[in-house]
Amino acid sequence: MKILKKWFLGILSFILLFLLATFIFHRISLEKEEASLSPMGQQVLVNGHQINIYVEGDGPETIVVLSGAGIASPILDFKNVSESLSKRYKVVIVERAGYGYSDDSNHSRDVMEVLSETHQALSQANITGPFIILSHSMASLESLAWREKFPDEVKALIGLDWALPSSYEDLKDNQALLTLAYWSSKIGLLRYFPESFYIKNQTLIESERKQYKLLAYKQLMSQAMLHESQTVKENAKKVPSNINPKIPALLMVSNGDGTSFSQFEWQRYAERFASDQSNVQVVYMDAPHDLYHYQSDAIISRIKEFLENN
């Protein structure tokens, strides 16, 4: 029994020392890495923190891109999409608080608060509507809230595998896992994970991958990311579950891989959402949740066709 106790205490001591050493190394590295970060875009002050806005292209119509949850660098994550669309449109990527080159924030992540910050950031950057909102996954909630609060600003909605409000009713709430992910990130355990864990855009060049990696170490999982994940089910109850008939919408829906739902369940949410809305077009794609990394050309083609016809 004494041997087992000593063995247990030895293992526990090793784990604690390992975590402490990792944390110290992580904090020192973050300070050094700050000098290597090369912000893309411009920063504006909103609610006491800097929000980063990236603009590409100068077309007559403006597409605002909103990323899904847990994306360390929305600018680099959507690089293929923004580059392609910027040849014809003005593409604006707004990095929410706690994402990319934006500051972290402990402000409320209520969906209306997040929308307000996005709206203020665009205004301060002198970017005016009407906007075509292109959003992924959880950003569906902000998109739907935008449609309700500022209807005259929304020309069209494009959903990249939207996590629709009804899906959050069935989403299993795992606060313990979120807390574990948060503290694992703060300690610096992400540094032991392979790049493929957090860099999904495999077309990035080496310098871009380095930037993405540094942003991942800094921002995953930020306070803002944690808080928005903790409040997402409540936020889903605050947005409308339909779209103004005057606003055309295109929903591109994945096969459910990468969500916690089966293909039938995931696509059924979109089917029900669009069932009585003639202005909502649904396209089903045989690709995972981050479908813009798997069928980029097809998605760009669909978006251009949709916008040309609307």
Identify the meaning behind each predicted range:
Residues 52-101:
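Conserved HGGG/HGGXW glycine-rich cap/lid loop of the alpha/beta-hydrolase fold
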Residues 93-132:
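Active-site loop/oxyanion-hole signature of alpha/beta-hydrolase fold enzymes
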Residues 133-135, 160:
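Short beta-strand immediately N-terminal to the catalytic nucleophile in serine-hydrolase-like folds
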Residues 158-186:
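Flexible "cap/lid" loop of the alpha/beta hydrolase fold
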